[in-house]
Amino acid sequence: MSSPPFGLAGIIGWPVAHSRSPSLHNYWLQKYGLNGVYVQLPVAPGMLAIAIPGLKALGFRGCNITLPHKVDALQLVDEVDATAKRMGAMNTIVVQPDGSLKGYNNDGYGYIQSLLDAQPDWRADAGPIAVLGCGGAARAVVHSLADRGAKEIRLLNRTNAKAQALATEFGSP
């Protein structure tokens, strides 16, 4: 009897030493007897264009993308799903059966789900919502809040220019 194919996955970012993703993913892989491992992939800024195409050659099934690469990674995959395209950022790459790379973004879904888990009757249109930061994850959160009917989203960021750019991108003056 042959064992199931080995699954190699990881998280690309800079830095990634603090990431809890490997501990979480490896726990579930082991708990359910899945043949795989999830590793940290520290990729410095400027090296992303080399790292992402290397996923296929190294036998990865996919990876997650974290700071500071969520926006830049969009240009480095073969296909981007519609949600990630609209959000302007991605956090997941899946190596397809044909070897092509497809990018996704599930940050917004996860954020909305965490709100609903904590407060099942939460509604996006109930009042103003503040978003702290304007990086790749914030883009997904703003998109998801707007999709759920948020009427007023206040962006708070260290630099006003980045907050203004994100607001403008999503249709606010």
Q: At which residue positions do the language-model features occur?
A:
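Glycine-rich adenosine-cofactor-binding loop
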Residues: 13, 103-108, 115, 122-150, ...
